[in-house]
Each structure stands twice: as C-alpha cells, then as structure tokens.
Amino acid sequence: MATVTLNYPDLVKLIGIDLSLDKVREVMFELGSETEDIQGDEVTFEVTSDRADLLSEEGIARMLRAYYSIETGFRIPKLQPSGYKLIVNREVEPVRPYVTGAIVRNVQFTDESIKSLMHLQEKLHGTFGRKRKKGAVGVHDLSKIKGREIHYRAVPGDSVKFVPLQSDELMTLSDVLARHPKGIDYRYVLEGKNLMPIITDDEGIFSFPPIINSKRTEVTLNTHDLLIELTGEDLRTIDYMLNIVLYSLDLRGASIYSIDVVYPDETLHRPDFNVRNIDIEVDYVNRVLGLELTAPDIKALLERMGFKVAETGSDYLIVEVPPYRADILHKRDVVDDVGRAFGYNNITPSYPNTPSVGKLTEATKLGDAIRNTMIGLGCQDTFNFILIGKDEVFGKMNLPDDGTAVEISNPYAEQYNIVRTSLIPSLMIVLSNNLHRDYPQNIFEVGTVAHLDSAENTGVKEIDHVACTLCYAKAGFNEIKVKLQSLCANFGKLDELKTVAAEHPSFIPGRCAEVRIGDKKVGIIGELSPVVLKSWGIEMPVAAFEMEIAALK
C-alpha cells in the first residue's frame, strides 16, 4: 500500500463541487482507499500501490469528478509539437537504456500545486519506479535549458562536474554518489556500472538520473514551462509514469507538447497517449460479480470509473482504457471497477449452491513444512513472480534457450515475458536488488516452475520446486550441501540423497552435482560461476541448490 497526503481545500477546488470531508472519505473507502490520518486541512489516504494514478491530489480529483459525473470517461490532452529532440546515445544501453519525456507550458504554480507535483514524483519513485531502479522522474525549468537538442549519454564518473540540487558545491558524478544525501540513498541503482547516465543541453549536464538534477534547472514558483524527463529499465513503465505526471499537470490547466526521442535505431514520439481497447462480455461481468446488469448499466458504471465505452452491443462492450491506468491488464480488472462503481456493499451475499469443506492440499502442506524447515536452517523466505524475463533465465544464467519456456504473447514488460523454468534466477534477482544490504544473504523460495510438455493435456507441465542460495564471502559447495542434507534429513530422505558430479553452464566446473533421491534426478547443486555472478552484478560468491519438492514426500 502507498499513502497520498493532500490539501483538502485544494482537492475540492479541483473536483469542482463542494463535498464534505466525510463524503470524500466515504466514497474513497467504497473505491478501495482508506483514510489514514487527518491533520487540519491535510488528509492522508492509503491507496493500493498498483493505482499509481491516484498518488496525487489531481489523480484523486479526476477519479471523483468521474464518479460524480462531472466529467465522465477521460479525455486526451491536445498535443502540439515542441520542436525539442531527446537524442539517446548508444552507450547508455547497458547502463540505463530507456528515456522518455515531454514539454509542459503555461504552468501556474501555487504552493499547493508545486508541493503536489513533488509529492507525486517521489511516490512514483517509491512504488511504480521500484525506488528509482525501474523508473525515475526529473522535472526541470525549461527556460534554463539551452538549445533544442537534449542528449542522454553515459560517461565515466569523474569526467564531468555540476552543482546538484541541495548543494552549492561543484561535484563529479562519483562525488555525488559518495557524499550527496541523494547519491548515498540511490547509488545502489548504478552499482556495478562502469559508466554513469547524464542528460545534457548546449551548456552541459543538467541531470544525473536517477540520482539528482542540476541546481541550474531547479523548479520554483516562478517557473512556467517544464521539461519532464524519465529514465529507467523498462520503457512501458516510464511511459506510464510520464502519462500520470502529464495528466496531473493537464488538470491544472497546463499545455502538453510532444518531443521526439531519437534512439540509434528508431525515433519515438512522446508522450504516448494511445488508448488500449478491452472487449468484455455482459455475461462475464455478471458471472464474476453475481449481478444481472445490462450493457447500458455496465457502460454507465464504467464511465463513472473514468473509462470510455467505444461500442456497446446487447451482450458485449468495447472498453477504452485511459492512458494513465497501468493497472488494467485483463478484463477482470475492468470488472473489478464495475463492482466498485456499483458498490460491493450493495451486493447481497449468498451461500454457494453446493456446500463443501475447504482444507489445504497435501502439496500445500508439504510446501509449508519445507518453508518451516528452511527458516529453521537460517534462511529467509521469499515470494517472487512466476513470470520472469527470458534474459534472466537464460542469458544471465549462461544457459542456451532450449525452447521449452512458456512465452507470454503480449507481456506486460520484457521482465515478465516467460514463465520461469527455474527458481534460482528469481533468487538471483532478489540478491542483485540487495547489493547494498548486509551479508550473509541466505534466501530460499518454494514455488512453481513450468515448461512446455506435449504429453500434458494443457501442453505445459507445472512442478513445485524449492531453491536456496547462500551469498557471503565463504559460501561454497560444502555450505550449501549442508543445507540440502539438513532439509532431506528432516523429511527422512537423507539415506536416499546422492550428489553426483555433473557439468552445468551456470555452475563452476568441478563444483556442481546432480541431486538424486534414490536413482531419480530431482535437482542441481553447486557454486555459481563468475560469469553468472558478473552478469547479475554480484561480487560475493553464491552457492545454490534447487530440487523438486515431490521428492521429499
């Protein structure tokens, strides 16, 4: 969950009608947000982190304007070309590959609106931007930027100097990471990188993303024109973050201008306000919610939730998703908003027609027992997404793509384009995201992996695995084998456990073995190779094992 603190009088002004605070709190609760705190005119709401569009006064005002039918659906801000180009140099690709942005003019800042913008910026960093690693926003005074060609480059840390925000000292990039408070907080994002990303104009550097901006382009109450730039590891993420910021400024009357983002191999026109369509059947909505709504009923409810309905038949609707709703991934997400607009409190509870008694499956009980054992062995439990990037499973693990992975035809992002075939890459993601934390880092996961199998009815075989990684200075084969032996002993399988020498591209030759229970191969154990560790940016040794949990029955 995330929190958003807003000024209540400013919110009412943005909504356009006089609403009591109690009424706002009531509606916010119905729509899934609770009131966390009230201090005078300052009200803090708790919102789910997937609703990044609600992390500002403007976002909440926009939602309430639609809910009260002041402005149903959504509109696309009129875009005009700015004449600015954002040129991406090829050397940034291994450092921080993506950038996007826009020009905003006719901004009329007040104390509240500038505070709201900065608040939104930081909330996006902490949620959607994954603490600036996946995406980060930079806001600049356009009048201080020289020239109409802006360059996104990567340079050595000691090659350029600038005066960062919250400082009067001329500093190199390395100095910023070592001594500036923001550099200390966020230097882990660039850990292991040989070059540092910068954004420059005709006068030189004015942004060190995702760390801090230059003092030269600082935004003040007297700023009327803005450059919004975002950098990150995923283009879709930063495009959505940009849209959220732009729609907030648009609600306050600003004008949006496009820029050309010139990559070495293509040119993108940003912002991208293209609308996605989702087809939804009336019967599907009613089956999920247990209601008897008609197509016109659903259309009216969706418009109150900020959607547009492009086409309606007697049994279907074509729904247009706003450019800032990154959380809408499936038609069930649309149904959820129908339910919120209808009011879940207005749905009459009923007992299912077939009575039954719920209980844990044997597989779930086994998984829980394994978790308890691994925790007792001093390892920390992790829960990772079953979707992962192909590069994480194959490229970074030094493995050839054998064609057995289940690929997603329309992935949310490149980091989630296949179903994982192993748990170890998921654990490596956790380790690579925690390079700034103390060691040892001994973690494990019990979870599902999958691969294509024509013998299965679905064409896919799913298997529950347990995997463990040890990451510290003395982590080695013997240390990880002790964990494996202790796990097997706890389930009465120690006498059947065998580790047979094997070769595997992810592991160091001579320090890798197959895990066998009886005569059946059920897993792998060993020390990860330096090639793998380097690809993840990990400098500590890592030892790991992974096996099927069914072998412990």
UniProtKB/Swiss-Prot annotation:
CDD domains in the cross-refs: PheRS_beta_core
Example of a GO MF term: phenylalanine-tRNA ligase activity
Keyword Protein biosynthesis: yes
Catalysed reactions, as listed in the record: tRNA(Phe) + L-phenylalanine + ATP = L-phenylalanyl-tRNA(Phe) + AMP + diphosphate + H(+)
Protein location: Cytoplasm
Major place of residence: cytoplasm
Enzyme class: ligase
Keywords attached to this entry: Aminoacyl-tRNA synthetase, ATP-binding, Cytoplasm, Ligase, Magnesium, Metal-binding, Nucleotide-binding, Protein biosynthesis
Pfam families the record matches: B3_4, B5, tRNA_synthFbeta
EC numbers on record: 6.1.1.20
Domain B5 span(s) in chain numbering: 273-349
One Gene Ontology cellular component annotation held by this UniProt entry: phenylalanine-tRNA ligase complex
Gene3D superfamilies cross-referenced by the UniProt entry: 3.30.56.10, Bira Bifunctional Protein, Domain 2 (3.30.930.10), Phenylalanyl-trna Synthetase, Chain B, domain 3 (3.50.40.10)
Record: residues binding Mg(2+): D327, D333, D336, D337
GO-annotated biological processes: phenylalanyl-tRNA aminoacylation
SMART domains reported for this sequence: B3_4 (SM00873), B5 (SM00874)
Cofactor: Mg(2+)
The keyword Thylakoid is assigned to this record: no
The family this protein is said to belong to: Belongs to the phenylalanyl-tRNA synthetase beta subunit family. Type 2 subfamily.
Subunit structure: Tetramer of two alpha and two beta subunits.
Protein name according to UniProt: Phenylalanine--tRNA ligase beta subunit
